[in-house]
Amino acid sequence: MVRWLYSTNAKDIGTLYLIFAVFAAMIGTAFSVLIRMELAAPGVQYLNGDHQLYNVIITAHAFVMIFFMVMPAMVGGFGNYLVPVMIGAPDMAFPRLNNISFWLLPPSLILLLASAFVEQGAGTGWTVYPPLSGLQSHSGGSVDLAIFSLHLSGISSMLGAMNFITTVLNMRNPGMTLHKLPLFVWAIFVTAILLLLSLPVLAGKFVPALNLAVCWELFSSVFSKIIDVKDDQQVTYESYNFIWNLNDCAPELSISHMSSLLFFGSYLAGLIEGDGTIVVPKQERSAKGKRNYPSVQIVFQLKDFPLCQIVQKLIGHGTISKKKQAAAYILTINNIQGLIELSNLINGKIRGPKYYQFVLLVEYLNKKCPNLNLKPAGFNKTPLGFDSWLSGFIEADGSFQVRTSLSSKYPRLSLSFELVQSRITHYGFTMFTIMQEIAIFLETNVNEIRSERKNPQYRLRTSSLKTNKNIRDYLVKYPLKGTKYLDFKDWCKVLSYFEQGTHMDNTARIVEIKSQMNQRRTVYNWDHLQ
């Protein structure tokens, strides 16, 4: 229940839109049947000559079918499902706004249905304005409820339209220009623009402001007793914080699972050693007179943008930029306070050659802040199986492989995990010592590859059932946080077939799993970060 109420995932919201549209369609169909029964023959048929009731049915049928069936299903349902997939986006541009857009619709439908129980109902048709909505035609509050219903559904559609427009304009895959967009995305995009231009008629006038003012007055009077507000005390939004626990985080994801500083510090150190740089300038100013600043940069794959936001939020500092000529984002921390926070997080948790760059960074920070008194805590000597350093290192450079060779007479299936590191020397050290330590932990070997090229590398590969189980057991204890977690889950499914000895019987299923792994993945689910 909590998941469906608070979910910001586009597929979840799309599912809710479709369920809501089906429910509204049944109500609208009932109205449609009544209208057709009444019009099936000349004269009075089933409504006993009650023309106001007929007008109410006509009005309700129009509102329900358009605002609660067609638009939620066609735009909200199929749009949320297909638009992110078709443009290569992980989600909508504003996931929390997506949640609000949907949950404005149920109260809107309730208000419309409630209008039928006040007086004789709102029988104005589309002209919900005077004289039909005046006191002579409708002396009660039925039209007010219908108008408020239109305001809510209108603002819901406006928020959704803004979300779709922003998503299509800003979250397309690199290289997907507007003329390459699928026609369905164009249809949603143009529809959203038309909605944004037309719906202020229903949702953006002065009347909604009055309605909201009245609503807030009622809200205050109802909840004042609950929160024990005295007569002379002003009721503010802070008074209701006990009702809603608002998790104000930068990405549209929960970060409670990474809030442990011990876990996050080791994970972050592994992430930096795997695909990060620590830059400390030798001179305060360049030859051209420009000031040089130290910085720490962490590289994330394009599809790991939510993880990049989470790391930025947990550090509390940093800027995210697109890496030029590469499908990646860079998180850069270059302000003094941010570097101090980062240094405290990873101090004593670095295992490889980047430790010497970290020492230079600490010296620079102590020089800039004499009262800091930050001291390097040395290399991380904790056994690999007892902290999350390796998890961050794998997040940066690990890959889960499923290989299939089915064209020959004897088909072959293999499962492996790989870690590759450059042999570049840092301060007289290479990554071989670290790679060898990981290999011993996983009970495998390290090989040197591309030795004849300019960029020789060390490669660690697990290929036996035992070594694959070792890496699985570790990552269950210290889970990955990015999209590699999705590859790991699929990889574990294939590993279970190998454990049971049924991998040859499930060849088709393994090929299907392989088709969605690594760079071929088209569907991303961030539920593991909820």
Curated annotation (Swiss-Prot):
Keywords: Endonuclease, Hydrolase, Intron homing, Membrane, Mitochondrion, Nuclease, Transmembrane, Transmembrane helix
Location, primary (coarse class): mitochondrion
Single Gene Ontology BP annotation: aerobic respiration
Membrane topology designation: Multi-pass membrane protein
Keyword Transmembrane helix included in the entry's annotation: yes
Record-listed E.C. numbers: 3.1.-.-
Region annotated COX1 exons 1 to 4 encoded, chain positions: 1-204
Membrane-crossing segments per the record: 15-35, 56-76, 99-119, 145-165, 183-203
Gene3D superfamilies, per database record: Cytochrome c oxidase-like, subunit I domain (1.20.210.10), Homing endonucleases (3.10.28.10)
Region: COX1 intron 4 encoded, residue numbers: 205-530
Matches recorded under InterPro entries: Cyt_c_oxase-like_su1_dom (IPR023616), Cyt_c_oxase-like_su1_sf (IPR036927), Cyt_C_Oxase_1 (IPR000883), Homing_endonucl (IPR027434), LAGLIDADG_dom (IPR004860)
One Pfam family this sequence matches: LAGLIDADG_1
Compartment list: Mitochondrion; Membrane
GO (cellular component) term, any one: mitochondrion
Any one Gene Ontology molecular-function term assigned to this protein's record: endonuclease activity
Post-translational changes noted in the entry: The mature protein may arise from proteolytic cleavage of an in-frame translation of COX1 exons 1 to 4 plus intron 4, containing the aI4 open reading frame.
First-level EC class: hydrolase
PANTHER family, A to Z: CYTOCHROME C OXIDASE SUBUNIT 1
Family: In the C-terminal section; belongs to the LAGLIDADG endonuclease family. In the N-terminal section; belongs to the heme-copper respiratory oxidase family.
Function: Mitochondrial DNA endonuclease involved in intron homing.
Descriptive protein name: Probable intron-encoded endonuclease aI4
Source organism of the structure: Mycosarcoma maydis
Phylogenetic placement of the source organism: Eukaryota, Fungi, Dikarya, Basidiomycota, Ustilaginomycotina
